[in-house]
Each structure stands twice: as C-alpha cells, then as structure tokens.
Swiss-Prot record:
Pfam families with a match to the protein in the record: Dynamitin (PF04912)
Subunit structure: Subunit of dynactin, a multiprotein complex part of a tripartite complex with dynein and a adapter, such as BICDL1, BICD2 or HOOK3. The dynactin complex is built around ACTR1A/ACTB filament and consists of an actin-related filament composed of a shoulder domain, a pointed end and a barbed end. Its length is defined by its flexible shoulder domain. The soulder is composed of 2 DCTN1 subunits, 4 DCTN2 and 2 DCTN3.
Protein family (similarity comment): Belongs to the dynactin subunit 2 family.
Stretches of the chain forming a coiled coil according to its record: 99-132, 381-401
Keyword Coiled coil: yes
Topology relative to the membrane: Peripheral membrane protein
Source organism of this protein record: Xenopus laevis
UniProt keyword list: Coiled coil, Cytoplasm, Cytoskeleton, Dynein, Membrane, Microtubule
Region (Disordered): 1-26, 183-203
UniProt name for this protein: Dynactin subunit 2-A
Domain of life (superkingdom): Eukaryota
Keyword Translocase attached: no
Length: 403
C-alpha cells in the first residue's frame, strides 16, 4: 500500500501506469554528426557490378589445404591464403616455380604472343610512321626473343623433362631425332673393326629422317619481310616527296600516290621538253594565248552587260519606293493607333471579367444571407413560442402558489 504522506501532493497522476524517466545526455553526447560525402577528385569511387563479379568468379574454388588462421604462440608463422603470378606448377598449392617450370612457362607465353601477333598482322593495317611499336617491329622482337630463349640451351642444363610437346613441337621433334641418332650409334660396330661385307646394304643401321615443314611459319616470315619493305618504301616516299607549290607550274601534278607514280610523271614531263617537240608546244601555246585574249574580251562585255542590268533593276526599285514612301508614315500612325485600341479593348475585357466575377460573388453572398435570415427567423419563432409556454407555466404555478 502506498505511503499516505504522498497522497495529497500536487502533480501526481492517479489511476495511471508509472513512468520512470532519466535525465538527458550531456550536450557533447547529444551532437549528431552527419557523414559528409567525399567529392574530392583525389578519391577514386569504384563501382562494382555484382553480375560481372559473379560471372568472373563463377565455378571458382578456394584451396583450403594447409591453411591455418588460428592465433600463434610460437615463432613459426601460420599459412593463410597465398596468391601469385601465373605459374605452371605441379600438384599442390604454395609451391615455388622450379627452373624447368619457369622455362616451360616462358616457352608457352612466347608461343601465345607469336600467335597473337600473327592475328594482329592479318587483321590490322600497317600503322603510321609516327607509331613507336608497329606489328612488324613487334613480330621481329618476338622472333628475336624466341631465338634468344632457344639459344640458351636450357634443355641440356635442366634435363630431358624441360621440353613441352604441346607448346613447342619443334623442340619435341629435335629431341626425338637426337634420340634416334643415339640409338643408331649404339648399334654400330666397335672402333677398329670393319663391318662385315654382305651382298646388300645393312638395313638395321639405316636411319630414316622425317622432315616436317611449317608453311604458316614461312608465310609469317614472308609477310614480316614484305611489311618491313613496305614500311621502308613509305619512309622513303615521305622523305623524297615535297609539298606541292601552287605558284610553280613545274611542280603541278607531281604529288603522286607513290614514288613510282611520281617518277613516271617526271619522266613524261622530261620527254615533253625535247627539242623536237618544243616548236609544236610553242605553236599550241600561241593559239591558246589568242583564244584566251578573245575569251577575256567576251568576258568583259558580258560583265558590263550584267552590271548595267543590275543598275536598271536598282533604279526601278528606287522609283517604286518613291511612290510608297509618302504613304508609309500614315500606315505607321494607323498601326500605332490600332495597337492602342487593341490594348484598351483588352483592358476593358479584363474589367468586364472582373465585374462579372464580383457580381457572381455578391449574388452568392446574398443567397447565403437570405438562407441564414430564414433560419434565424424560424429559430426566433420557435424560441418565442417556447418562452410563451414557459411564461404561461410560470403564471399557472404562481396562481397555484397564491391560492
């Protein structure tokens, strides 16, 4: 039961559930900081496409073999996830490339690079002279890289397992040929003993050589040589070719599509300068000069006739304008008056619209006032009848009390 001394205290809510409230937090804790969005250009905003990420990592698995993420109390390190560059490794994870595997990987990558360069040369046109690395130069560098890799003779140092039959068929073929030669040498007679003479050749000591030709490699080398030749011809044409001078008539038409066209044009012009043909050229030039003079005279007469016709047309236009210039001020004054009339008519229309709207508002107000007056009169009649009834009742009671 509640203590009776708190019964009559003010501000106590009775018959309501108890509410326990705590004081507010300090002002430092009440402050709310809105995180500002970084708009600096130094911050890179990366947009991740979930569909592309799913397609990239679909059907991929993470190797959990020999993994240990637990805490350690010893000095030995725990092994977590490992990542590295592309390597041709055997079974197991976390192994380092051996020299043989590194040699195999390099051969494989050089082979892939050669195929990509061949595709590029077959699809892409020869690049411009200002490009630093053309497909032709890239093909030469790839060939030199492959030759340098093969010339290191790493197969002798790394053992017979260094060759890859799939990525380097030439190396596999050479290895097979050397093996057959070694086997043939072992079957020969020892030194100092002459072979036995027989009626026919010894078929067991014969060695059969199979030579395989790669036409695509020959085509590639020929295409590289042709591309290099075309590049050098283009550079020579750029160096020999000069800009066409429009002021010099001797250089007109010398801008050929290639060096051979320019040489042919020059040869034709040199043939025209022969002594036997100079007289004919001079006679033709004299006839052409006479025709040019006649054309110039006719052209001057035609230009004079055109100028005279234009002057007549201009004079007729001025005459028409003189007749219209007298009526132009009156037309302008009428247009200004008509503009003022239109403006006044627009204002009058706006006033009529406002007056009509005001009249409708007044009519609605009068109608509302009439309805309100009728209701007031009806209420007054009812109240008056009620008052009369009350007075009659009071009079009756007074009479009863007086008796």
């Amino acid at each position: 039961m509640a203590d009776p001394k708190y019964a009559d205290l003010p501000g106590i809510a009775r018959n309501e559930p108890d509410v326990y409230e705590t004081s507010d937090l300090p002002e430092d804790d009440q402050a709310e900081f809105d995180a500002e969005e970084l708009t600096s250009t130094s911050v890179e905003h990366i947009i991740v496409n979930p569909n592309a990420a799913y397609d990239k990592f679909k059907d991929k698995k993470v190797g959990t073999r020999s993994l240990d993420f637990s805490d350690r109390i010893t000095k030995s390190k725990r092994t977590g996830y490992e990542s590295g560059e592309y390597e041709i490794l055997g079974e197991g994870i976390g192994m380092k490339e051996t020299p043989q595997q590194k040699y195999q990987r390099l051969l494989h990558e050089v082979q892939e690079l050669t195929q990509e360069v061949e595709k590029t040369q077959s699809t892409v046109k020869e690049s411009a002279a200002e490009e630093k690395l053309t497909p032709v130069a890239l093909a030469k560098q790839v060939a030199s890289l492959k030759q340098q890799l093969v010339s290191t003779h790493l197969e002798k140092l790394l053992g017979p397992d260094a060759a890859i039959n799939l990525t380097d068929p030439d190396g596999a073929l050479a290895k097979r040929l050397l093996t057959q030669l070694d086997a043939a040498k072992t079957r020969k007679n020892p030194e100092g003993k002459s072979p036995a003479k027989g009626p026919g050749p010894d078929t067991e000591n014969l060695v059969t050589y199979e030579l395989h030709c790669r036409p695509e490699q020959n085509k590639f080398s020929q295409a590289a040589k042709m591309a290099e030749l075309e590049k050098r011809l283009g550079e020579l044409e750029v160096a020999v070719r000069c800009d066409q001078d429009t002021q010099n008539p001797l250089t007109v038409g010398l801008q050929g599509s290639c060096l051979m066209d320019t040489v042919e044009i020059l040869q034709a012009k040199v043939n025209l300068l022969d002594v036997a043909s100079l007289d004919q050229v001079e006679a033709r030039l004299q006839s052409v000069l006479g025709k040019m003079n006649e054309i110039a005279k006719h052209k001057a007469a035609i230009e004079d006739a055109d100028t005279e016709s234009k002057v007549h047309q201009l004079y007729e236009t001025v005459q028409k304008w003189d007749s219209m210039s007298g009526t132009l001020p009156q037309v302008v004054q009428r247009l200004l008056t008509l503009k003022q009339l239109h403006e006044q008519a627009m204002q009058f229309g706006q006033l009529l619209t406002h007056l009509d709207t005001t009249q409708q508002m007044i009519a609605n107000s009068l109608k509302d006032n009439t309805n309100a007056l009728a209701m007031v009169q009806k209420a007054m009649k009812e109240n008056l009848a009620t008052v009369e009834d009350n007075f009659s009742n009071i009079d009756g009671r007074i009479k009863k009390l007086s008796k």
